């Protein structure tokens, strides 16, 4: 009997150990499964973070491209506006004929000199005809200049103005106040509000 009891105790002990091993294996399996789930979750989160970062980068690149396109279009529009402004500027409209006017003014000077010479001729009739023709030519030229906005500067009898007059000499005079223009050697001209040439004048000064 004693021998039989001893033989039965062995299987009971082995069964307990086996049950404990199975429980341990089950626990380890559960732990591994949980770790696997956590690893999978972390991987999914990492992939999602990478995807979000890629989306953000793509969005930034698209935004940068939009800003660049806007900048280029704005720059092109500004350049077009600048060119139009250059073409249409009032400055150009007002002073575009300045070179032509400067070329015509010496012709008027020559006509004035011719008119002065005819006064001393011995043939009154010829002198009168020549004078009339020259005067008519002068009037026509002045009309052309006036059409383009050119006017003569008023000088004789005016107070000397360095903005419009250039004094070549000063002459003593009891009849005029000091700094009064009493003679004009060469006429001055304005193109609208711009000085083309000052008038060359003599001004009065009081006697010492």
UniProtKB/Swiss-Prot annotation:
This protein's GO CC annotations: cytoplasm
Transmembrane segments annotated in the record for this chain: none
Location(s), subcellular: Cytoplasm
Keyword annotations from UniProtKB, A to Z: Chaperone, Cytoplasm, Stress response
Protein's UniProt keywords contain Cytoplasm: yes
Pfam families associated with the record: GrpE (PF01025)
Record-level Gene Ontology MF annotations: adenyl-nucleotide exchange factor activity; protein homodimerization activity; protein-folding chaperone binding; unfolded protein binding
Composition skew (Basic and acidic residues), residue ranges: 1-27
Superkingdom assignment: Bacteria
InterPro entries hit by this protein: GrpE, GrpE_coiled_coil, GrpE_head
Region (Disordered): 1-65
Presence of keyword Transcription: no
GO biological process terms held by the UniProt record: protein folding
Listed Acidic residues bias regions: 45-64
UniProt record similarity statement: Belongs to the GrpE family.
Self-association state and partner proteins as the record states: Homodimer.
NCBIfam families according to UniProt: PRK14140.1, PRK14150.1
Biological role: Participates actively in the response to hyperosmotic and heat shock by preventing the aggregation of stress-denatured proteins, in association with DnaK and GrpE. It is the nucleotide exchange factor for DnaK and may function as a thermosensor. Unfolded proteins bind initially to DnaJ; upon interaction with the DnaJ-bound protein, DnaK hydrolyzes its bound ATP, resulting in the formation of a stable complex. GrpE releases ADP from DnaK; ATP binding to DnaK triggers the release of the substrate protein, thus completing the reaction cycle.
The protein's name: Protein GrpE
Lineage of producing organism: Bacteria, Pseudomonadati, Thermodesulfobacteriota, Desulfobacteria, Desulfobacterales
